């Protein structure tokens, strides 16, 4: 199994958002990915990034959007 490096994990309501660095079969870094996992078992890769800075910024923007959506639902 190839390693992955997780830079962030957040849980918002019934969803979890995770951003990780994935590696190729030869253990060379491949890409950063942000995934959303739902309690019902559904999951989806929502973004891919080239750099760690892009991954952090992208992850934070998804978290912000999910928080806004949740706050709108609760209002």
Where are these regions (language model features)?
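A short, exposed loop/beta-hairpin motif centered on an aromatic-Gly-Thr core
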Residues: 38-58
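Short N-terminal "domain-start" leader segments
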Residues: 1-33
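Conserved catalytic or regulatory cores that recognize and/or transform ribose-phosphate-containing ligands
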Residues: 35, 48, 63-65
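Short arginine-rich
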Residues: 60-75
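Generic alpha-helical secondary structure signal
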Residues: 27, 53, 63-66
């Amino acid at each position: 199994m190839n390693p992955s490096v997780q830079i962030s994990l957040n849980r918002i309501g019934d969803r979890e958002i995770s951003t990780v660095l994935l590696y190729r079969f030869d253990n060379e870094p491949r890409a950063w990915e942000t995934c959303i996992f739902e309690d019902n078992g559904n999951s989806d890769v929502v973004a891919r990034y080239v750099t760690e800075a892009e991954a952090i910024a992208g992850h934070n923007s998804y978290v912000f959007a999910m928080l806004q959506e949740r706050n709108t639902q609760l209002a």
